[in-house]
Regions:
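Bacterial Sec-dependent N-terminal signal peptides
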Residues: 1-26
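Extracellular/oxidizing-compartment recognition motifs
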Residues: 25-498, 505-506, 522-525, 542-549, ...
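Alpha-helix capping and helix-loop boundary segments enriched in small/acidic/polar residues
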Residues: 149-153, 190, 198-202, 212-214, ...
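C-terminal capping/lid segments that line or modulate ligand- or cofactor-binding pockets
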Residues: 224, 294-296, 499, 517, ...
Length: 891
């Protein structure tokens, strides 16, 4: 089909059903990727929206943004701070460039759009955002703590009272902490966040959180309470990463401003400092790594209420700020996202019970129990059981180095006060577990309903969905998402129990899985800021981020710390937003330059290699050089995007040098085999596109043969799992990839599912003796592959952010139907197909203001129709709208 015919066909598809056009509106208004956020520090926040128009071919032609402090003015289309006027553009990501924003101010913004027929959106669409401190000098409160040292175990309470003598219009609490905190006013906890603030390199960047506390404060006398936890700041548990020796370590501290705005327009700030009192709480020990201990006999009832008698409390100690960079926590918070009832209970005797949640999670348990004062309840959390039915934690405590027996791993301790039923749930800890073994120092009676679990993680919106006709695929997808979320706590982790570390290798493997399934840009922007904090002057990054200093000498290298390039690049592809790529550009360049200077031949042996392979080991130089090449290619592309032409030329040449050196050493061109031809050695070069174009077909063919010879089972480690399915699918062997993905016998993802897994594991054998966490995300690329291959949904590098969508669904033997959807920046993309009596039916949805190109499988003699209209090409351009495409095989 010639290009002219394609254009005509596309136009026809765009015009089809215009008579059925629907009302046009603007939805999903966000500021900095959050809905009506408060406490932003950005002087130039980003505005995003979506066009809601089901008409075929719907497209935004112009937009207008209005910003003001008065929402009523915006309804009348008046704006004092910023009025862009009608801008001819189809973009929906715009950076604010109006008048200078002021701190502590609520702003409203409105966006109006028009389509190609100048039909304007049908109502005023108004959102808001509110600035926070914006500058360090705007803080009025002092950093305070108690007078204890880092070795003291109980967590401290802090309190103060104040009078609000006028009618309050609004009130905001701004709280920064090194450690963790819970804020309360007049006896009630503020907000539903958990584990605030997020973990950072405390001596380089500390986060603060803003709360709307208008409804919590009453006219008259009020009380503020703060409970501090250790978090990663005062790590008292000892393990192989030496967080107990962190350079920032100190007793937890906080700074608080509560800003009151009265109805008469005046303001008042209640601040931390002189007059505050402190005492020890009933939390007699808390470790984010191990557990929490609580002595209910020490409870101070109503300690955070106005009339509490605090005469016995001590004065606070003033402290210096933990860093010179106190910035807003502008990201999706950690929450108790799902309450999970116990699936079963087993009673061993009157002092020992086992609860099973039915699935492996990250989070906490909550127990409700009654017993005599002084009764000690221990709640041991684990992922698996011994044959006798008791909880086995030997797979997750391998790196723990306790100095005594007072802090058992993943074991909460509750001491009862004898005052009837009481409930306990940790404040400053989370664990990875499915089972909870409850033991008591004396007889107790428990029912199944007495213990529930809470699945805790960063509460990122779900934006993806996968469904298939094959149950094993559905189980794998479910388990992959469980592991992804179990390892998202303001930064991506490897596992929620044994380590809780921000391992870079695991995160670069899972980045696409995360972005297809969840709206995670705010988490990754925060974590890449952690990268920038941790990078050494020579460009080296540690293998875990954040870190106390561990990881600069082991575990890092391009196969792990390529996160500095791979994650910003993927965020750019998925969101069409250059900011993270631009913010990290100097760091990527510094990193690449370090490798270039250290390994001038273009080949590097720096890295861990294909971690935890099934059986075959690939040379570290082979895999690390592929990642080095990927970093340089990303750097060159970023240079071009950001207008740095000299860098573009420089790093394009460096990429060629690496590619030539790599293929000269490892590629047998005649045979089409890399090194010895095992799965990782063949798939990693294909995936990262370092294979010479003329050799791709033969290398892919040999990879498919290798996989078939391996019985369609995996023979890869961490790096190979990122590549294997994609390398096959992208090069004509999607059926082979599917046989691997849907495999149910060892070694495979399905093997885990067949043995009861609800998450992904760290090792292929379920009876491995080491490296056997049962909730790891490092083999999680299969989640992204389901979107890319059977789903066929891919971003277009030339029009990122799914402005243009590449649809390339692969019809695979063994699947009768498949559905994938992803809510991108422009709306919901749907790609579904099913087998019919005479072919394949595709149901496609392209969101308004975007376009797509679909590549259908070549099938000689088949007829293709789009919404009932026959076309002669298997490559079809689509405007926005819904399509039924039928590919029928002639008799």
């Amino acid at each position: 089909m010639n290009q002219r015919f394609l254009q005509i066909t596309t136009l026809l598809f765009a015009l089809f059903s215009l008579s059925k056009s629907s009302a046009q509106s603007v939805t999903a208004l966000k500021t900095e990727y959050l809905v009506n956020p408060i406490g932003l520090d950005s002087t130039n926040p980003r505005f995003t929206w979506q066009m809601d128009d089901a008409s075929q071919g719907a497209k935004q032609s112009t937009y207008r943004i209005l910003v003001d402090t008065d929402s009523a003015s915006l309804i009348k289309a008046n704006a004092k701070l910023w009025n862009t006027g009608w801008v001819k553009s189809d973009q929906n990501l715009i950076v604010y460039s109006g008048q200078l924003l002021k701190p502590f101010t609520k702003y409203f913004w409105r966006v109006d759009i028009a389509d190609g027929n100048n039909k304007k959106s049908n109502k005023a669409n108004i959102a808001s955002f509110e600035t926070g401190m914006m500058k360090m000098e705007n803080w009025q409160g002092s950093w305070i703590s108690d007078t204890e040292n880092t070795k003291l175990k109980p967590a401290p309470y802090f309190r103060n009272t104040f009078n609000a003598n006028k009618k309050i219009k609004s009130a905001r609490a701004y709280i920064a902490a090194a450690g963790l905190y819970e804020l309360s006013i007049n006896g009630k906890k503020i907000g539903n966040h958990r584990m605030d603030p997020m973990y950072t390199r405390f001596d380089r960047r500390t986060l603060y959180v803003t709360y709307d506390v208008t409804d919590a404060i009453k006219q008259g006398k009020n009380a503020i309470g703060v409970l501090l936890g250790n978090g990663w700041y005062n790590h008292q548990s000892t393990a192989v990463w030496y967080f107990d020796r962190a350079p920032w370590r100190n007793r937890p501290t906080f700074c608080l401003d509560v800003r009151l705005t009265y109805e008469d327009g005046t303001t008042e700030t209640i601040k931390s400092g002189k007059g505050w009192k402190t005492a020890l709480s009933p939390i007699i020990f808390n470790s984010i790594y191990t557990a929490e201990h609580y002595d209910a006999r020490l409870e101070k009832t109503d300690w955070n209420t106005p009339n509490f008698d605090d005469k016995g409390w001590k004065d606070v100690m003033f402290r210096s700020a933990p860093s010179k960079n106190i910035v807003a926590q502008a990201l999706h918070p950690i929450r108790d996202v799902e309450e999970i009832a116990s699936k079963s209970i087993r009673k061993f005797n009157d002092t020992t019970y086992l609860f099973d949640l039915g699935k492996n999670i990250s989070g906490v348990s909550k127990i409700t129990v009654n017993g005599p004062a002084g009764t000690v309840i221990k709640l041991k959390h684990g992922e698996r059981l011994y044959p006798n039915g008791h909880v086995d934690i030997s797979n997750i405590d391998a790196h723990y180095r306790p100095t005594d027996n007072t802090d058992p791993f993943q074991t909460d301790i509750l001491i009862l006060n004898g005052k009837g039923k009481q409930s306990f749930m940790p404040h400053f800890n989370y664990k990875g577990f499915q089972y909870v073994e409850v033991t008591s120092s004396g007889p107790i009676q428990l029912q199944k309903e007495d213990l529930v679990g809470y699945f805790m993680h960063s509460d990122v919106p779900v934006v993806g969905e996968v469904k298939s006709s094959q149950p094993i695929i559905n189980k794998i997808y479910y388990a992959t998402n469980n592991s992804y979320l179990s390892n998202l706590f303001g930064y991506p982790t490897d596992c929620p129990q044994r380590e809780k570390n921000g391992w870079t290798g695991d995160a670069q493997i899972a980045i696409e899985t995360g972005l297809y399934g969840f709206d995670g840009i705010t988490i990754y922007e925060k974590w890449l800021a952690d990268h920038r904090d941790e990078q050494q002057p020579n460009g080296v990054l540690p293998s875990i981020i954040p870190t106390d200093g561990w990881g600069y000498e082991w575990g890092n290298g391009p196969d792990w710390t390529s996160t500095i390039a791979i994650i910003p690049w993927n965020v750019y592809l998925f969101y069409g937003d250059q900011k993270l790529l631009a913010d990290c550009y100097p760091n990527i360049r510094k990193y690449v330059n370090h490798i270039d200077e250290t390994y001038p031949t273009g080949l590097t042996t720096w890295g861990l290699g294909d971690w935890i392979p099934v059986k075959s080991k690939s040379p570290v130089e082979l895999t690390s050089t592929c990642y080095y090449y990927a970093d340089v290619v990303i750097l060159a592309k970023a240079a071009k995007i950001l207008g740095k032409n000299d860098d573009y030329l420089k790093y394009t040449a460096l990429a060629k040098k690496i590619k030539d050196a790599f293929n000269a050493k490892y590629l047998n061109k005649e045979k089409g085999i890399y090194n010895t031809g095992i799965q990782t050695e063949m798939s990693v070069p294909l995936y990262w596109k370092i294979v010479p174009e003329e050799s791709v077909a033969l290398v892919a063919k040999n990879l498919a043969k290798r996989v078939e010879a391996d019985g369609f089972h995996l023979d890869v480690g961490l790096l190979g799992t990122k590549a294997i399915l994609n390398a096959l699918s992208e090069n004509g062997y999607s059926d082979v990839a599917y046989k691997v993905a849907a495999q149910k016998t060892y070694p495979s993802w399905g093997w885990w599912m067949e043995n009861g897994a609800t998450t992904l594991y760290e090792n292929w054998p379920i009876d491995a003796k080491s490296d056997i966490s049962m909730n790891h995300i490092m083999f999680g690329e299969i989640g992204a592959w389901l979107y890319k291959s059977p789903g066929g949904i891919k971003p277009d590098e030339k029009q990122p952010g799914f402005k243009h969508i590449i649809l390339d669904p692969h019809i695979m033997e063994g699947l009768d139907n498949f559905e994938a959807s992803h809510i991108g920046p422009y709306g919901k993309i749907s790609s579904a197909w099913k087998r019919t009596n005479n072919g394949i039916r595709y149901d496609i949805t392209i969101p308004a203001n975007s376009t797509a190109s679909i590549n259908l499988p070549v099938n000689s003699g088949a007829s293709i129709s789009v919404n009932g209209k026959i076309t002669s090409s298997n490559k079809i351009d689509l405007a926005a709208g819904k399509y039924v495409i039928e590919q029928k095989v002639g008799k």
